Amino acid sequence: MEPKFWQERWARNQIGFHLPEVNPYLLRHWSHLSLADDAKVLVPLCGKSLDLMWLASHGLRVMGVELSEQAVETFFSEQSLTPHITRRGAFTVYQADLLEVWCGDFFALGAEDLADCTALYDRAALIALPPLMRAQYAEHLNTLLRPGCQGLLVTLDYDQTQKAGPPFAVTDDEVAVLFGLKWTLEVLEARDILGESWKFVQDGVTRLDERVYRLVMR
């Protein structure tokens, strides 16, 4: 899956993955993390998510990472924010108060970029990636983040033979393989959401489960 794929999705406004509201799982489960009041939160593949604003509104320092320049500029425009724009290595960084969005390739991040990140929020990053890239993504997080980091991870699970991704199916077993050696994993919530997902029903999917994990890096 090349960067061009996502850039074209944004250019065509094919962004069904975008939620027009703060994610309910974030509202329900962020309090399960034991974080400093001003913790820095990494939000990979953030798009123009309203979750960024919610996190910043709670005094957290937010570091979104997004490939699409259009997504980043749309986010700041829609939130009526005028960012300060700088270059940091391979990234263009848009900053407004507690909020930073790094525009560029997530895989170009180095350990120094994430040195003060003590929290992770992944609502739509892992499930946006095909299998090989999921392994690379997890390994990147496992390598760059530090012990004690805590996070929320949201996944979808369905029969991948019934529908092509994205979003891709990620099983509980795969989460354990990707993160189990480095993180303590706890399922906070699991729901059957097929009845709420007409597009999946239309495509012939017969099972659709959403899970929310609490992760603590060891």
Swiss-Prot record:
GO terms for cellular component: cytoplasm. Its EC number is 2.1.1.67. PROSITE patterns: SAM_MT_TPMT (PS51585). The keyword Ribosomal protein does not apply. Its main location: cytoplasm. S-adenosyl-L-methionine binds at residues 10, 45, 66, 123. InterPro entries: SAM-dependent_MTases_sf, Thiopur_S-MeTfrase_Se/Te_detox, Thiopurine_S-MeTrfase, TPMT. One of its GO terms (biological process) is response to metal ion. It comes from the Bacteria. It catalyses: S-adenosyl-L-methionine + a thiopurine = S-adenosyl-L-homocysteine + a thiopurine S-methylether. GO terms for molecular function: thiopurine S-methyltransferase activity. Signal peptide: none annotated. It is found in: Cytoplasm. Belongs to the class I-like SAM-binding methyltransferase superfamily. TPMT family. This is Thiopurine S-methyltransferase.
